[in-house]
């Protein structure tokens, strides 16, 4: 089995038919209002203390050679779990395999098991006893890399509700989890403030960010952080003259530069992205390609949690964050018109404040960390390996 997994990953076997995927995803668009009409999950956190005692210890593993955003995800999950008393060790591929915790959650398996010493962890016992946290969109080569590891695991968690649903249809244990949805300040280090990108900020955006800063008081009109793609490049080139009239911050990283790492100048980028969003009226989300996944890191962690209004081209529906209630959604062709209305008219400013207030209420009142952790622990307790209890 180990050889099969390695061959599939190294040789890139298998692919997703994009036409079939588009047909499937278009059907999932009907999910939006239907899901909201369903009764809410009846499980609560009354059994949390028993679950914490039962599960006891969890290891969250993330590659040291992967994207720094995966470290953000691991830290958010660990913070949520620790807040309820769970013992959590955030580990990497250099940890001792034989003394790993009884419950192991591997973040971004396409990175962890294929980079550096992570290949040493491609063992039947590790994979069959572990849980995987999927982070990649179904149509991508990174998803293909992660698929063998996910299928060999005891269960998978995913930040995308549609991806988790697809695995559930295969009778696999799967759970959608949205970690760390809360307002947060993003302090910069002195080294961050020496980064070239910090040097181009307007003076009013150089101070500490405040998620509660009013829409009209934010010095940056529109910001975008992401990786360059033909679709994104075409959008920004087509609308360059429009954006030139506004205070904008646009960081499009070229794919050839590789993942954003935690060390060196790259280490400042994720903090700077949050800092910029915290000073932006609008955080823009333009999908890399035609499949409009709800992009948690940019839309929620960077944008909404920084108090910025998120504007996106159409997304797959999300069970909690609803288009035109918690973010504004528009066809990419008409996004400049929407931005102009928001930034230049009183009606637009009122709409921006309405949506920001909805997000504030949702994050403050609906994302109970205890319930989120209880769902995760219940999932681990139900599907873990009995041999490693």
What is each of the regions a protein language model found here?
Residues 346-385:
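A charged, aromatic-enriched C-terminal amphipathic alpha-helix characteristic of glycosyltransferases
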Residues 316, 321-324, 329-335, 362-364, ...:
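Conserved catalytic or regulatory cores that recognize and/or transform ribose-phosphate-containing ligands
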Residues 20, 27-101, 108-125, 129-323, ...:
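Nucleotide-sugar donor-binding catalytic core of glycosyltransferases
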Residues 276, 338-341, 379:
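CheY-like receiver
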């Amino acid at each position: 089995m180990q050889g099969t997994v390695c061959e599939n990953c190294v040789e890139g076997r298998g692919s997703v038919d994009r036409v079939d995927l588009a047909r499937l995803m278009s059907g999932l668009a009907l999910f939006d209002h239907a899901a909201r009409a369903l009764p809410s999950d009846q499980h609560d956190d009354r059994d949390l203390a028993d679950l914490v005692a039962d599960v006891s210890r969890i290891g969250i593993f993330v590659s040291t050679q992967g994207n720094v955003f995966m470290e953000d995800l691991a830290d958010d999950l660990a913070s949520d779990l620790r807040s309820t008393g769970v013992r959590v060790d955030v580990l990497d591929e250099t940890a001792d395999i034989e003394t790993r915790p009884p419950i192991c959650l591997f973040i971004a398996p396409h990175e962890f098991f294929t980079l550096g010493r992570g290949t040493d962890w491609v063992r039947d016992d590790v994979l069959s006893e572990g849980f995987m946290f999927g982070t990649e969109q179904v149509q991508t080569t990174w998803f293909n890399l992660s698929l063998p590891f996910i299928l060999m695991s005891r269960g998978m968690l995913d930040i995308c509700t549609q991806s988790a649903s697809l695995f559930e249809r295969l009778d696999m244990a799967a759970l959608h989890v949205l970690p760390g949805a809360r307002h947060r300040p993003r302090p910069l280090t002195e080294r961050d403030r020496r980064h070239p990108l910090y040097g181009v900020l307007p003076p009013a955006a150089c101070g500490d960010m405040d998620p509660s800063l009013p829409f009209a008081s934010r010095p940056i009109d529109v910001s975008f952080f992401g990786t360059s793609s033909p679709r994104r490049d075409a959008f920004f080139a087509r609308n360059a003259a429009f954006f030139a009239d506004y205070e904008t911050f646009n960081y499009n990283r070229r794919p050839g530069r590789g993942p954003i790492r935690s060390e060196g100048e790259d280490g400042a980028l994720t903090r700077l992205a949050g800092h910029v969003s915290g000073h932006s009226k609008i955080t823009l989300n333009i999908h890399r390609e035609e499949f409009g996944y709800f992009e948690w890191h940019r839309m929620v962690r960077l944008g909404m949690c920084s108090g910025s209004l998120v504007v996106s081209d159409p997304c797959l529906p999300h069970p909690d964050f609803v288009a035109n209630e918690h973010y504004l959604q528009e066809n990419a062709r008409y996004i400049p018109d929407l931005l102009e209305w928001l930034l230049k008219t009183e009606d637009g400013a009122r709409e921006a404040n309405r949506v920001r207030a909805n997000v504030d209420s949702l994050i403050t009142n609906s994302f109970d960390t205890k319930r989120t952790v209880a769902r995760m622990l219940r999932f681990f307790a139900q599907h873990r390996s009995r041999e490693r209890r």
